[in-house]
């Protein structure tokens, strides 16, 4: 067969070592330590970092505060990520806010004077602040105390003002996404003291940000895990300036002519049907994308994305084929996404099934509120150009394992590659020094398969390609090498390891009747 890679003409004169991944090529069926993470979200004016530029890695939380602002979206992403991946190399690109954007706001109205002593509780983002209320405190005094408490905390992503017993809370960042910050804000009395505090409707910010320039900045480098703050609740497109365009960027960057191995991780705060609409959009139907869904959560979708990027890094940086099945908070596996305040917003069994069949990974919760994953999947679930479901590249480790396998093969090739090309030597003749041959290339690829399917694998001494003997033989049989006028073409069908996701036990009760 004539082997060609997408986007690279057969007569392209430039020297190269290129690769193309074609996923879902098998039979139909129903990081390394060098991997880094980039956060792509909003800063505040307090941060010194220029927008839409990629600077040095973030050194620590104080460096993050100085460069992006302590109340910023990036700062809260950084905190969420560091809970699970304290050693990861983390970059950030600040997305410029829309020039006409407005902040989100909400009011809290205090009704009357307190008839006794109590504590006013302020819950946000998994944190609780408390304000002492004394008997006789007027509505305005209570509102002022609440407002002062909010403004005194430098880590909250909003600030307040007060007038006539009404406190108005305004987000630090602008645009419609900032409404998530206020949706999760709860204020209430620990003990009823003859008054109330009423939360008004959240007025969502306006003027969505556009990721186009930030993506241009990211196009100058290669960072494995991307955790953007952009999110969606409906279908996306490849030119929408947000989720769909980000997916298209990752797709384009992975093309053979560019050759960057990257993945993008999004957070969704929406219903199951809304998540399906996002992930099954043609622009988002991508093996290199992951959508992690919560509903009415105390964390923003941006924080969920960052936390899940940390989880992926933690699991895959040593063993790229790691499973997320059953991932939960435990010794060595931090997982801190909070249980929704409204327990009806936990995903039901039916919703989990629907999510997993439509390219969405739901964040599940135990009856006691512990977060966990049923399994992790990519957003690819539809055969392109059709309405047919395709689950051959569903498991989340597939792009990670194939990227690691390619990196291993690439490193072996560049250390043994010779400057010249020739056909295979005659039977019995010794290979000639300084020449690559089709047979030599085939032996190299088969050797890589043997290593990556055995305990000799450099990835924690565990195979990242399927070690089943039949799978190994299929991979070896799939190797195709062709000699060209000035190079070699190679095709191989790698099969990543398969995870143990489903174990069924049938227990039969025996014994005599009595």
Name each model-derived stretch.
Residues 1-35, 43-50, 55-299, 303, ...:
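Polar low-complexity, Ser/Thr/Gly/Ala/Asp/Asn-rich disordered segments used for subunit assembly
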Residues 268, 299, 318, 398-400:
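A periodicity- and composition-biased signal for non-globular, repetitive helical segments
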Residues 285, 290, 309, 343, ...:
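Intrinsically disordered, low-complexity regions enriched in serine, threonine, proline
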């Amino acid at each position: 067969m004539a082997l060609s890679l997408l986007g690279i003409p057969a007569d392209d004169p430039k020297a190269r070592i290129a690769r193309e991944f074609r996923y879902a090529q098998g039979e139909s069926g129903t990081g390394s330590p060098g991997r880094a993470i980039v956060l792509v979200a909003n800063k505040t004016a307090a941060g010194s970092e220029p927008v839409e530029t990629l600077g040095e890695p973030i050194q620590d939380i104080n460096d993050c505060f100085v460069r992006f602002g302590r109340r910023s979206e990036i700062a809260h992403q950084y905190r969420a990520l560091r809970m699970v991946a304290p050693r990861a190399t983390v970059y950030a690109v600040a997305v410029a806010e829309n020039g006409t954007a407005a902040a989100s706001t909400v009011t809290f109205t205090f009704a009357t004077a307190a008839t006794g002593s109590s504590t006013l509780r302020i819950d946000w983002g998994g944190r609780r602040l408390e304000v002492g209320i004394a008997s006789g405190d007027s509505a305005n005094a209570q509102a002022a105390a609440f407002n002062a408490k909010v403004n005194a905390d430098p880590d909250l992503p909003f600030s307040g003002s007060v007038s006539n017993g009404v406190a108005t809370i305004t987000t630090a960042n602008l645009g419609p996404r900032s409404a998530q910050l206020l949706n999760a804000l709860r204020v209430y009395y620990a003990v009823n003291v003859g008054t109330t505090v009423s939360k008004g409707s959240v007025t969502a910010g306006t003027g969505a940000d556009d990721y186009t320039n930030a993506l241009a900045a990211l196009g100058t480098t290669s960072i494995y895990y991307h955790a953007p703050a952009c999110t969606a609740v409906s279908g996306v497109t490849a030119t929408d300036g947000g989720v769909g365009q980000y997916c298209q960027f990752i797709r384009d960057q992975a093309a053979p002519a560019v050759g960057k191995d990257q993945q993008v991780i999004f957070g969704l705060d929406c219903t199951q049907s809304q998540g399906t609409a996002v992930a099954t959009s043609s622009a988002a139907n991508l093996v290199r994308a992951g959508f992690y869904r919560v509903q009415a959560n105390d964390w923003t979708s941006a924080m969920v994305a960052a936390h899940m990027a940390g989880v992926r890094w933690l699991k895959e940086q040593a063993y790229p084929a790691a499973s997320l099945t059953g991932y939960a908070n435990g010794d060595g596996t931090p997982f801190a996404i909070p249980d929704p305040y409204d327990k009806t917003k936990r995903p039901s069994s039916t919703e989990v099934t629907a999510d997993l069949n439509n390219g969405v990974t739901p964040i599940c919760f135990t009856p006691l509120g512990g977060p966990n994953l049923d399994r992790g999947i990519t957003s690819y679930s539809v055969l392109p150009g059709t309405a047919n479901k395709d689950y051959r590249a569903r498991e989340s480790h597939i792009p990670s394992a194939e990227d690691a396998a390619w990196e291993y093969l690439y490193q072996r090739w560049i250390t043994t590659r010779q400057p010249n090309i020739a056909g295979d030597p005659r039977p019995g003749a010794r290979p000639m020094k300084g020449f690559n041959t089709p047979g030599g290339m085939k032996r190299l690829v088969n050797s890589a398969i043997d290593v990556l399917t055995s305990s000799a694998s450099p990835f924690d001494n565990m195979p990242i390609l399927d070690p089943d003997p039949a799978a190994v033989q299929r991979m070896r049989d799939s190797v195709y090498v062709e000699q060209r006028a000035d190079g070699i073409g190679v095709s191989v069908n790698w099969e990543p390891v398969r995870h143990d996701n489903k174990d069924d036990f049938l227990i039969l009760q025996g014994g005599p009747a009595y």
